[in-house]
């Protein structure tokens, strides 16, 4: 069993934290606040929480997640009056108001492979290699009872607020290029390959990918406003412009999560009208937060409390390796 989290009310100013700075510098990173008289010990009456994120490796679990450069999320419980429980991601909705994220090839491949496997599709074991000028997709194609190597050189387009489209430019089956023969016979890919799953559909020579509900809980309510290919994945702009946001006046490290408002249930504790700053326990490393394994991270982290109810949590990146494709 992991050791319990350490709770420190005030650390002597002579001590230093993992950044080599005095812990009080983190305790004062968030402006002081005054709680309204209507805020009780069991609940604040707030219907939602604002989650501000900067330069954070955010995982839903070990092999699914994305790197968030900047983001504002409004978190709401699905049951009115209930606190947001980190132990039950299905009971919350994350409404992304604005943000910029990087989705790695490994994460996208894992999500699509899970979708293909659930539908027993004739394509499996996708692997992706993305560059700024295009993407290479490798996998296996079921033809005449045999799984055969499949390779495609594709472009990726944003075809809707919740849809991206893979457009194959060159197609190889069993190591043989079939692009020109299909074109010469005026045959579209969908005529020789039937592909329709919950989130993927081959229409003509285009593979549509529906992003709505593709990620595991919590429910993500968002729209993609811009897509750009990058080495190793996709850069997505979500929701409104970040420039229109009034960011909190924090004096925090470059990498953090800041929760403001609402009631948050973590393990057996409820943060009433939450006012919490999450930072990394590892010196010089970005915050890595693993939602499905947050308890283990907190057990190996450090929690500090302030008189006005602000909580500063230094998170340990335990059990959180870099994403790898799930071969199904």
Protein language model annotation of sequence segments:
Residues 4-328:
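Extracellular/lumenal and peripheral-membrane lipid-interaction modules
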